[in-house]
């Protein structure tokens, strides 16, 4: 602003003063300059001897320039201030003197307008009442309309500022406002517009004081509602809409609310009556007004030949009043009768030109119909603005009204040549504006263009108004031959068909036309369509998107090449800008099944930057920035790991099992069987197991969708990068479910800090130095606090004693490619198909048989896979089977804690301890005996366990043989193929017992776990980690007895060995077959196991850890046994 510039250091510079470089160059402050300016203006009006600036013009010649002088003076900022009071006082005196004279009254009003706006508060309060009286005197005179208009403008400012000062507000309300209104009501007819402006100001700033004259004001406004002057009619409607707020209301505006509703119903009743009079007989089924409103008594001129015109003018005025009441702010809450208003709108829009007779007054009624429809559309727009999205329940009705109106006013639009305005464009423009407003208010819920007959009709009209007109020239035949045949008669030379350009039509090159014809309706259609696509794009049908692509892309290219220009609406820059806006909307909100035209849009926006119109070129530049952000984001995406893992979190480096990790997510009941046993490896094709599929985790929180491994990842903080989806992580021979991706390439390490939105119930830590089995060390903590450390053959120099009954050396598994999926007992996979029938165990990892032989040995042990459907840990993907099914979460937690402690000890003594399978079995027998002594009530169960142990030992021996032959691989595939990288020795946390609500695994599983070599062979073929899930039956338990070598040992091992995982392996291997069958025994067995485990840990921690370490060593060979699939082939 100029004031800000002048108040700065250079405020007094001559550059800021048009007067020249004379005396003002020495002025150093803005206030001083303003004082000189005020004195200069005063000198222009009345010369003074002491003025610093001599008058330039005589006073009589300064009057025409005074309004301009006031405006120029305002450019220099406020003239108020203590230092300017003297100058302002002089201006006040001048103003009062000029207002007292008829000849100089206009000049006095000019000075008063400056004083009212620029005077300080103290000066304003001092002179406000006197100024108000002066204005009232001016209103009572017969001055010219220009003087009255200026007086009303000053009055408006005066009332606006006085309403802000309580003392003045009270004084004016009680003593002056009624007189002012009376003076305004008495103005001459030629000053009616100024009178309405003054009344509007009084009702706006002093509504309560106007209540005494409410009746007179209402009559005055109604008499002007049907005025022919648009400005006067608009002012009368605005004033009438404020009538309900006049006067004193009750405490909460109740009286005002009732007045507002009465006025609205009265307007509706009057509008229904007027519509019936206008189109009597033209309505097929007129809607009768049933509202409580009383029809207004409007004056009518009898004998007027243009009564229809008067009715139309009244209809327009009352409709505007109704719309203003809906759209204007009101001091109290009101209830809008939406249904009644919509009924009136529908009744008005249903009047069609087809039903109007062309006799008598018919043509005149037809002439008025478009304007009547426009008033109804304006009312609909006001209703949408007032009610917003609360009109959604009437969305279908609104969606039908718009194409209905477009159909009514589409007659004769195709018969005109380019360059001519199409008929009814104003009505169609209003319809498209309402479409844009409706979508803007309701968004995608508006339901526009989302199918249905009305949507198709609306789209057809939109495309018609967007498409540029085409020159249509038709061939005509020689005269006298309408059919085109030559005339008969004298022979003559053959004649050629000529172009029919019309008799009175000039050649196309010299045609007269409007270059901006139809630009308004085209721009409105483009805006409405752009808004609809942007808000509802993904919900709109694919075919609609394709139609728009086929229209918009060629149209943009034609506009850029100048082919579409000429007499088309796209000569207007507004239409071209809206066309680019539509293209951007198609790009930002595409159909899910129709790719957006990204490449074409980028090219179009690049060329659009060369537009001559700054408005168009700037929009294209902005659109390019938006497209660049979409195609080349400068910031990496939040989830770079891959789409298949919805909530993966980076895996921290391997760390020792922590006893602090509680197994809070042990869902009791059969649910665990389905969800907790997901296998990391490929899902076996066994019929029952697929049902488990990617099992949703039973834990609360975001559902963990099946990961790339086909397993639900409940407990893992993140999925190892190598398990993430990727070409190197997908094996060709994948089974039904996604396969654990054992790739030969080293997996990328994931920073432990990153978490991609997934919750972190129990973190699992996996560290991969290489993709080779020997280089992989996995430390997973299960929900049951069980942690298993698997060191593939390469890492531990100690000989790998088979953890389960089988003692196959890890070398055999090592022989197969390094990537040998840990193989659960081959019998388990066989039983899994049958077992899943009773139990829906979590899907076993699909057998990695097809996977590359060199699958990385890293194995994932299901961390605390809750016995319930809780999210299965990736550890299950390994051949490790967590079958411990307990009905009591407490027992599982205790066992898990013991197992975690044992796991820590195992990891420490892993390399040092190596024991034979016989010792391992003896420990299991001792644990069983301890359980029997501790729990006499469960003697029967203990006996069954012993029997099962014996059976499992035999089965383990058989499994060892089977594994050596590689037969277990196929079985594992059927049951639950363990992930090729997971060694069978890894014992899943005891939470898996919950996974299988059926009987808990008995020591037989431990025996099998001790047979990692055979299991590894089978795992290589099938990698069934989920086999434990399919161990619900005893037979299955026996089969699992072989596979449990890969599965986690039961808690019994935990007691015997300091490391919890060995006990889990024993229990799981034994329970893999037995526990699944006797679910009731599971809790008791687990409790006995937990107690005996505590004792065994103290007594035989070292021995147990050694046995388990041997088992774990054997497990890596199982991972290496992924070649077993190839071995069976060989």
Swiss-Prot record:
Cystine pairings recorded for this chain: none
Region ranges (Disordered): 473-497, 639-1130
Annotated compartments: Nucleus, Nucleolus; Nucleus, Nucleoplasm; Nucleus; Cytoplasm
Motif (LXXLL motif 11) on chain: 584-588
Keyword vocabulary terms for this entry: Acetylation, Activator, Cytoplasm, Isopeptide bond, Nucleus, Phosphoprotein, Repeat, Repressor, Transcription, Ubl conjugation
Composition bias, Pro residues: 639-671, 685-703, 794-824, 835-860, 976-998
Low complexity composition bias: residue spans: 672-684
Short sequence motif named LXXLL motif 9, residue ranges: 459-463
Motif LXXLL motif 1 in this chain: 33-37
Tissue specificity statement from the Swiss-Prot or TrEMBL entry: Widely expressed.
Motif (LXXLL motif 6): 264-268
Phosphothreonine: residues carrying this PTM: 488, 745
Positions of the UniProt region annotated as Required for modulation of ESR1 transcriptional activity: 2-80, 121-189
Motif LXXLL motif 10: chain residues: 579-583
Cross-link Glycyl lysine isopeptide (Lys-Gly) (interchain with G-Cter in SUMO), sequence positions: 826
Record-listed Phosphoserine modification sites: 13, 477, 481, 1033, 1043
Subunit structure: Interacts with HRS, RXRA, SUMO2, HDAC2, RB1 and STAT3. Interacts with PI3K, SRC and EGFR in cytoplasm. Interacts with ESR1, the interaction is enhanced by 17-beta-; the interaction increases ESR1 transcriptional activity. Interacts with CREBBP and EP300 in a ligand-dependent manner. Forms two complexes in the presence of 17-beta-estradiol; one with SRC (via the SH3 domain) and ESR1 and another with LCK and ESR1. Interacts with histone H1 and H3 with a greater affinity for H1.
Record protein name field: Proline-, glutamic acid- and leucine-rich protein 1
The organism of origin for this protein: Homo sapiens
Lineage, opening ranks: Eukaryota, Metazoa, Chordata, Craniata, Vertebrata
């Amino acid at each position: 602003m100029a004031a800000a510039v002048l108040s700065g250091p250079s405020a007094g510079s001559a550059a800021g003063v048009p007067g020249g470089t004379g005396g003002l160059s020495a002025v150093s402050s803005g206030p001083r300059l303003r004082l000189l300016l005020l004195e200069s203006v005063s000198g222009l009006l009345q010369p003074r001897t002491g003025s610093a600036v001599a008058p330039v013009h005589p006073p009589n010649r300064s009057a025409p320039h005074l309004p301009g002088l006031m405006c120029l003076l305002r450019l220099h900022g406020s003239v108020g201030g203590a230092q300017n009071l003297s100058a302002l006082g002089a201006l006040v005196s001048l103003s009062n003197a000029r207002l007292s004279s008829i000849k100089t009254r206009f000049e006095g009003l000019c000075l008063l307008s400056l004083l009212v706006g620029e005077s300080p508060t103290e000066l304003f309060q001092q002179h406000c009442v006197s100024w108000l009286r002066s204005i009232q005197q001016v209103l009572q005179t017969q001055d010219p309309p220009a003087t009255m208009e200026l007086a009303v403008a000053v009055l408006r400012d005066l009332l606006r500022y006085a309403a802000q000062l309580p003392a003045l507000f009270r004084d004016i309300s009680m003593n002056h406002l009624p007189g002012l209104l009376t003076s305004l009501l008495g103005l001459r007819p030629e000053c009616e517009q100024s009178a309405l402006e003054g009344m509007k100001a009084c009702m706006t700033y002093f509504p309560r004081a106007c209540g005494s004259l409410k009746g007179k004001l209402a009559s005055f406004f109604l008499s002007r509602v049907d005025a022919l002057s648009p400005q006067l009619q608009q002012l009368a409607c605005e004033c009438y809409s404020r009538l309900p707020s006049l006067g004193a209301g009750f405490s909460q505006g109740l009286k005002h609310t009732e007045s507002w509703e009465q006025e609205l119903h009265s307007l509706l009743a009057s509008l229904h009556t007027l519509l019936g009079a206008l189109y009597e007989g033209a309505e097929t089924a007129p809607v009768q007004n049933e509202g409580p409103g009383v029809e207004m008594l409007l004056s009518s001129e009898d004998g007027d030949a243009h009564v229809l015109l008067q009715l139309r003018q009244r209809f327009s005025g009352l409709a505007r009043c109704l719309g203003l009441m809906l759209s204007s702010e009101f001091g109290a809450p009101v209830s809008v009768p939406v249904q009644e208003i919509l009924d009136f709108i529908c009744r008005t829009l249903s009047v069609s030109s087809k039903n109007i007779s062309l006799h008598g007054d018919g043509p005149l009624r037809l002439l008025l119909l478009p304007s009547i429809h426009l008033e109804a559309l304006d009312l609909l727009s006001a209703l949408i603005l007032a009610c917003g999205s609360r009109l959604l329940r009437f969305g279908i009705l609104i969606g039908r009204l718009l194409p209905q109106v477009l159909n009514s006013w589409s007659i004769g639009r195709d018969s005109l040549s380019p360059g001519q305005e199409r008929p009814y464009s104003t009505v169609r423009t209003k319809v498209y504006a309402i479409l844009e407003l409706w979508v803007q208010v309701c968004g995608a819920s508006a339901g526009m263009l989302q199918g249905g007959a009305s949507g198709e009709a609306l789209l057809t009209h939109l495309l018609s108004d967007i498409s540029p007109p085409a020159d249509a020239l038709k061939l005509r035949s020689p005269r006298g031959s309408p059919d085109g045949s030559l005339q008969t008669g004298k022979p003559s030379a053959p004649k050629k068909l000529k172009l029919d350009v019309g008799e009175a039509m000039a050649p196309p090159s010299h045609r007269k036309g409007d270059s901006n014809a139809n630009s308004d309706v085209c721009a409105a259609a483009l805006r409405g369509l752009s808004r609809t696509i942007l808000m509802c794009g993904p919900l709109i049908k694919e075919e609609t998107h394709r139609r728009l692509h086929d229209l918009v892309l060629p149209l943009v290219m034609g506009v850029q090449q100048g082919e579409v220009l000429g007499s088309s609406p796209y000569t207007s820059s507004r239409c071209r800008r809206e066309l680019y806006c539509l293209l951007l909307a198609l790009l930002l909100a595409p159909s899910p099944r129709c790719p957006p035209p990204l490449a074409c849009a980028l090219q179009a926006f690049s060329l659009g930057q060369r537009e001559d119109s700054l408005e168009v070129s700037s929009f294209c530049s902005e659109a390019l920035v938006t497209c660049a952000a979409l195609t080349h984001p400068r910031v990496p995406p939040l989830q770079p790991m891959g789409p298949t893992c919805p909530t993966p979190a980076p895996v921290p480096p391997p760390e020792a099992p922590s006893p602090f990790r509680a197994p809070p997510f042990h869902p009791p009941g059969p649910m665990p069987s389905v969800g907790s046993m997901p296998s990391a490896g490929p899902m076996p094709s066994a019929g029952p197991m697929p049902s488990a599929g990617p099992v949703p985790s039973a834990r609360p929180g975001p559902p963990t969708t099946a990961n790339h491994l086909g397993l639900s990842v409940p407990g893992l903080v993140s999925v190892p990068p190598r398990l993430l989806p990727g070409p190197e992580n997908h094996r060709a021979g994948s089974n039904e479910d996604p396969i654990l991706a054992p790739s030969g390439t080293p997996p990328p390490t994931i920073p432990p800090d990153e978490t991609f939105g997934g919750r972190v119930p129990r973190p699992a830590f996996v560290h991969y130095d290489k993709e080779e089995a020997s280089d992989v060390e996995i430390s997973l903590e299960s929900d049951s606090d069980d942690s298993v450390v698997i060191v593939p053959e390469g890492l531990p120099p100690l000989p790998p004693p088979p953890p389960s009954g089988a003692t196959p050396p890890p070398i055999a598994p090592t022989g197969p490619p390094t990537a040998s999926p840990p193989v659960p007992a081959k019998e388990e996979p066989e039983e899994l198909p049958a077992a899943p029938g009773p139990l829906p165990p979590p899907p076993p990892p699909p057998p990695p048989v097809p996977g590359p032989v060199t699958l990385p040995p890293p194995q994932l042990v299901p961390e605390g896979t809750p016995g319930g459907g809780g999210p299965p840990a990736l550890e299950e993907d390994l051949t490790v089977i967590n079958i411990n099914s307990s009905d009591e979460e407490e027992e599982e937690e205790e066992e898990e804690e013991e197992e975690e402690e044992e796991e820590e000890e195992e990891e420490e003594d892993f390399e040092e301890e190596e024991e034979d399978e016989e010792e391992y079995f003896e420990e299991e027998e001792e644990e069983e005996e301890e359980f029997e002594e501790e729990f006499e009530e469960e003697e029967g169960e203990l006996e069954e366990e012993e029997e099962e142990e014996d059976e499992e030992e035999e089965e383990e021996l058989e499994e060892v043989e089977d594994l050596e032959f590689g037969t277990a691989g196929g079985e594992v595939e059927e049951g639950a193929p363990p992930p090729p990288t997971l060694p069978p020795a890894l014992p899943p946390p005891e939470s898996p017992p919950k996974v299988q609500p059926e009987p808990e695994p008995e020591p037989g599983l431990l025996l099998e776990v001790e047979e990692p070599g055979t299991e590894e062979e089978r795992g290589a073929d099938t990698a069934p980690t989920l086999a434990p899930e399919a161990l619900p039956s005893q037979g299955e338990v026996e089969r699992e007895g072989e596979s449990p070598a890969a599965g986690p040992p039961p808690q019994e091992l935990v007691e015997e060995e300091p490391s919890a995982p060995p006990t889990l392996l024993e229990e799981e291997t034994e329970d893999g077959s037995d526990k699944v069958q006797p679910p009731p025994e599971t809790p008791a067995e687990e409790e006995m196991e937990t107690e005996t485990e505590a004792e065994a840990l103290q007594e035989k921690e070292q021995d147990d850890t050694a046995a388990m370490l041997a088992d774990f060593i054997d497990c890596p060979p199982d991972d290496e046994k992924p070649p077993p699939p190839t071995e069976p082939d060989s």
